[in-house]
Amino acid sequence: MSVTELKERHMAATQTVNDLREKLKQKRLQLLDTDVSGYARSQGKTPVTFGPTDLVCCRILQGHTGKVYSLDWTPEKNRIVSASQDGRLIVWNALTSQKTHAIKLPCAWVMTCAFSPSGQSVACGGLDSVCSIFNLNSPIDKDGNHPVSRMLSGHKGYVSSCQYVPDEDTHLITSSGDQTCVLWDITTGLRTSVFGGEFQSGHTADVQSVSISSSNPRLFVSGSCDTTARLWDTRVASRAQRTFYGHEGDVNTVKFFPDGNRFGTGSEDGTCRLFDIRTEHQLQVYYQPHGDGDIPHVTSMAFSISGRLLFVGYSNGDCYVWDTLLAKVVLNLGGVQNSHEGRISCLGLSADGSALCTGSWDTNLKIWAFGGHRSVI
């Protein structure tokens, strides 16, 4: 069989797969008679409301000299680590705004960072295709730098995100531009499992984000530039357990819902979506129309402790607070006093749900605290 014939057969098979996928999508839409917001309205659910003092900027963390790309909170809620284009990781005391560590990175092109569950170590990765681990208790060297305690090498593309397995300082999952996710044993520095990639059923484009279920740490979800999100079981690396369709652009961010049965996605297409991992159904779309025709991309997202609120960062500097039940925007932090002056690149909620931190291309991080008549939701 000639190369031309093989290409023709491949194109025909691809078209068949796409046709079947579209039929499956239409069938699911027929069976799904309502979405979450429709059901909530039918049950008489009232919308969440915010007053002018219910979520306010209480801290501005200044110290980076380049765009902030990533942030993460410690489980004990009072420290934040941030990664910036300036080639540094900074660990902040969220209560005082003071810097406790400033780590100069071996590679300045960092894209992601994460705190270990114990808060004793931080991880980061970027265009060097390596995930570097720093022990915050290690002494600095003669040049005043923190030494790398472990380098996790094995990816063939940039490291786009990393997250420690809950309650474990010894295992971590990374996603990469090489279309794979990897579970690492930090103690040995070796790959425990590789998810996707050549000869495996996985993503067909760069993987941008991962989120591990807190209720079942064996499960994690990944989002990719192939417009899909996939559910994985760490015990079965050869294939994804589920594949979720619906987006029309790169999936930039994924986040598990607090109960572990659902997860959210955010995309270049300007939408966030809520999926159920048990039924594979899309439960809700969160989209705010823009009159000027320019659709801002979703960059980051986080759920409140109860899941009733969804915080979403956008490329135009908006940061919407969504009512997840009614699919309504209840507040835009991009339009209030002390809002960021650039793209919202990352955000995260403290462990107790009492504060939100946002990071931006304006080089700053801001901490937003619940106050007024609004308690933690």
From Swiss-Prot:
Domain of life: Eukaryota
GO biological process, one term: G protein-coupled receptor signaling pathway
WD repeat residue intervals: 63-93, 105-135, 154-185, 202-233, 246-276, 293-323, 339-369
GO cellular component: cytoplasm; heterotrimeric G-protein complex
SUPFAM superfamilies the UniProt entry points to: WD40 repeat-like
One Pfam short name: WD40_Gbeta
InterPro entries attached to this UniProt entry: G-protein_beta_WD-40_rep (IPR020472), Gprotein_B (IPR001632), Guanine_nucleotide-bd_bsu (IPR016346), WD40/YVTN_repeat-like_dom_sf (IPR015943), WD40_repeat_CS (IPR019775), WD40_repeat_dom_sf (IPR036322), WD40_rpt (IPR001680)
GO molecular function: signaling receptor complex adaptor activity
Family (UniProt): Belongs to the WD repeat G protein beta family.
Assembly information from the UniProt record: G proteins are composed of 3 units, alpha, beta and gamma.
Alphabetized PANTHER family for the sequence: GUANINE NUCLEOTIDE-BINDING PROTEIN BETA G PROTEIN BETA
Protein's job: Guanine nucleotide-binding proteins (G proteins) are involved as a modulator or transducer in various transmembrane signaling systems. The beta and gamma chains are required for the GTPase activity, for replacement of GDP by GTP, and for G protein-effector interaction.
Name the record gives this protein: Guanine nucleotide-binding protein subunit beta-1
Organism: Nicotiana tabacum
